[in-house]
Curated annotation (Swiss-Prot):
This is Transmembrane protein 126A. Protein required for the cotranslational protein quality control in the inner membrane of the mitochondria. Associates with newly synthesized polypeptides and may act as a chaperone that cooperates with OXA1L for the insertion of newly synthesized mitochondrial proteins into the inner membrane. Required for the assembly of the ND4 module of mitochondrial complex I. One of its GO terms (biological process) is protein insertion into mitochondrial inner membrane from matrix. Coiled coil: none annotated. It comes from Pongo abelii. Residues 1-34, 79-107, 177-196 are mitochondrial matrix. Keywords: Membrane, Mitochondrion, Mitochondrion inner membrane, Transmembrane, Transmembrane helix. The gene is TMEM126A. Its main location: mitochondrion. Residues 56-57, 129-159 are mitochondrial intermembrane. The lineage of its organism: Eukaryota, Metazoa, Chordata, Craniata, Vertebrata. The chain crosses the membrane at residues 35-55, 58-78, 108-128, 160-176. Interacts with OXA1L; promoting cotranslational quality control in mitochondria. GO terms for cellular component: mitochondrial inner membrane; mitochondrion. It comes from the Eukaryota.
Amino acid sequence: MENHKSNNTKENITIVDISRKINQLPEAERNLLEHGSVYVGLNAALCGLIANSLFRRILNVTKARIAAGLPMAWIPFLTTDITYRCFVSFPLNTGDLDCETCTITRSGLIGLVIGGLYPVFLAIPVNGGLAARYQSALLPHKGNILSYWIRTSKPVFRKMLFPIMLQTMFSAYLGSEQYKLLIKALQLSEPGKEIH
């Protein structure tokens, strides 16, 4: 039991040291390191709004713009922001993620799956429900639902290829920059300590 306490104390000292060094960075760099997930979340919200617009055009949905637009912006934003914080920002700031390649891979995958593909898949039931409610498009019968949605989604995925790739590259780049800023912060000397 005592060994467990000493490990926690050592880990807490490490987290305190890392946060103290991060606070020594200039404000712009510190903001990028601490709030980078918000930028990825904003890009995901934009992907959600674009996918929503494309599905609305295909399904001829003209009503409930705000009712469909708000969840298509907020849900991808919050999901991407929280996921990026949990799997990239927090492990970087606690010292659990100490490999640049791992950071780039994690942040790129979050950008691709959560920030790019998830908003497009989320737009399908939102706009499908609106099309059924307002009867703006002929929806399939029970037998061919899957083939209908695959056929309907293909042009949307083609048009969303660029925003999804942009989101992936931006997220990977942001992860790389955050890792470099963390390394820069860790190399700063303590203000009260002298190096001999």
